[in-house]
Amino acid sequence: MNLPSRIQDLNYNLLKLSSLVETNIKDAFSAVEKKDLELSKTVINTDSKINMMEVEIEKEVNDILETFRPSDNDLRYLLAALKINNELERIGDYATNIARNTQFMVEHPDLELPDVLAHSAETLTSMLNKAINAFILSNEQTALD
């Protein structure tokens, strides 16, 4: 497989990871808001898949670096992909931590979540989606928006 094909595969895997993280963010906020323990367990269990995907993507980038010795532009792209990969995993951890608060909300039914919380989930996932797409498509204007 040549370098452009490997980078295309890497992009696909980053999109899959990003999509999984976005879903977990939405589900985590929803679980807390609705006090849904089952949904919170799903988010928590999905975190291990996110962690495994992060490790696989890191291995993939390292393999590309060893195999192809990429040019400056490709090297910068691959290093950025590593950073994004790490940040996606970290965001996934935050989603898990949010989901873990569901039990607290169930135990304290008198507590109400601020309306801004639901809006925060929408804003966060929208920003994440735009950032990943800008990176994958190498679209500077989208990244600046």
Identify the role of each PLM range:
Residues 1-145:
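Cytosolic, long alpha-helical scaffolding segments
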